[in-house]
Amino acid sequence: MKSISGLFLVMLASGAPLHAQLPAGIQFEKGPLNSVTIERAGQRLVIYGGRDPGADQVLITHVRRDLTEFARLAAGNSGKVIAPVSVADFLDYPSAHWTAWWEKRFDYYDQQVTRLPISPLAVAHPVAGGDTLAGPGGLEFRVLETPGYTREGITYLLELEGKKIAFSGDLILAGGRVPDLYSFQDAIPEAKIGGYHGYGGRLGQLVRSLETLAAEKPDLIVPLRGDLITDPQGDIAELITRVRAIYANYLSTNALNWYFKEERLTAAGRLVLGPEAEVELMDYSEHVDLPDWCKHLGTTKLLLADDGAGFVLDCGGPGPLADLRKALAAGLVTRIEGIFVTHTHNDHSAAVVEAAKEFGCPVYAVAEVADVLENPGAWFLPGTSANAVEKVTVLADGEKLLWKNYEFTAHFFPGQMYNHGALLVERSDHTPVFFIGDSFSPSGIDDYCLMNRNLMREDTGFFLCFKKVRRLPEGSWLVNQHIPHLFRFTPARLDLIEQRYRERIELINALTPWDDPNYAIDERWAAFYPYGQTLGSGATGKLELRVWNHSVRDREIRVKLHLPPGVTTARSEAVLTLSAHRHGSMIFPLAIANDAEPGVKVITADLVSDDFDLKQWAEALVKIE
């Protein structure tokens, strides 16, 4: 089992080995976040942050709230904070972001990590690549633009006593690693790929930033987390090799080849793999036209019964809803008797509430989908529609539903996203058809958005989907909601997809210091429920913290809440014990003061276990009215 103590565990630098690498006068303290202090000419400069307030200058490399709060401690009331120019305005007034976020979180497809600052942090000196920053005693820091782990990332370069030292934040960790993979999700404009489909979208920027840093030939790199990097060239080369292997693997079984085609995916691949790289893509599996009894209406499928009734899978917006109205007006169907929702993205669910009301029919879903449909504000997931469905009939995994000349079997099917279902459709005159939402296409698997929670575990995620597809009756077809075809994989093709997926697990495991790669791909392994709630002044409520222990061992996790003014709780600290590969929760009561200031407030939680200490990791929104 891999130890993650090098990244997160509270551990002070022990004696000479770490300090001996640094020039005299640079103090390095290792902890959950590393702290660097330089004192010269009666001035104290701190890099990243620290527990002693009153530093004259505090340099930060990017904007995540664990780092900005660490910097705030060091700056105290008088210290000058130096930060990337692109985020200076945000740091001046973060409440504007959170107020807008109350609405923006719905129908959201930019897919950026949400662990952003809550309280303002005045930036005395915004800096950008190419700038030179004066430090105490005549020291000079050069600034490099090094985006990758974050959009705004920068690196500070210092030459002292014949050594060139780089302070690069979370750009690279010792051993050629990074803290996680989901932080690299982003748009790839060069390939006309948006943020939602941008798996590893900033890995190309990471490679270029690492090459820029390598060209500077630093003697040491001091990251925000973990050990000093004493072999910069070796660790940089190792990290580039690792991310290229992961991205090549991802592209080789990519469902997007069906939609975006070779030109766009090759363009995306070469940004990471190199300008002349050969990009391997999977060719299309067998596919044929839909049967006459299944009509393709955008992302909606309409099933026709022998007596003229219709049954709908998904209804994602005005277009599909208008098509259903046309089908009724034209007599293609005489009535619609039910809607099954495969998953929670708005292009499959936004018009469900209107359709159900207009057609007077029930809505069906598996439990993991149903709660998001009924309580969308309680969740933060990609593309969640704010249009709440009043009543969803929950179908258990494996539950059968007889409708007209059809037999339906509902399945929990956590492929494209964790909150995902599927419907096996059988009728006497046709081979079984498995409507799998958006989880596969004829060219592979739909795992292009890490925020969808594509868990890489034997008991769930795509491995569960592979098992269910293999168990289908021989000759069964698959249907993707976006595709007007039946398709199916040969056993050999499914074996290849699964083999590549297993290989990627090992590659991700080597990329990050976590003891299980799922922490590196699952941003919401610890998340509040409800994510957002509205409470009036003087009201009470509750907040549940849901935690997944992805580790193969038991964990005790200590939790501490950080509450905004006007919000209190009877207990702000608690301990959760979880068995290996289990998830659990704890509930915190909330009380809103009678004189609480109205507006959107943010609650956060620290998470501490024996080998990690994560500050303000999870957040929830409370709108006080």
Regions found by a protein language model. Give the residues of each.
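Conserved beta-strand hairpin/beta-sheet module of binuclear metal-dependent hydrolase folds
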Residues: Q21-G54, Y156-G169, L173-A174, E278-A329, ...
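Active-site HxH/HxHxD metal-binding segment of metal-dependent hydrolases
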Residues: I26-K30, G50-T132, P320-A322, A327-L402
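Metallo-beta-lactamase
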Residues: R44, T132, E140-Q233, E238, ...
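Low-complexity, acidic Ser/Thr/Pro/Gly-rich terminal tails and inter-domain linkers that flank the onset
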Residues: E506-G536
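Asparagine-centered strand-capping/turn motif at beta-strand->loop junctions
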Residues: V547-S551, I592
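Short acidic, flexible loop segments centered on an aromatic residue
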Residues: H550-G566, L607
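Intrinsically disordered, low-complexity Pro/Gly/Ser/Thr-rich segments with frequent PxxP/GP/PP motifs
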Residues: V567-N594
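Terminal connector regions
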Residues: N594-E625
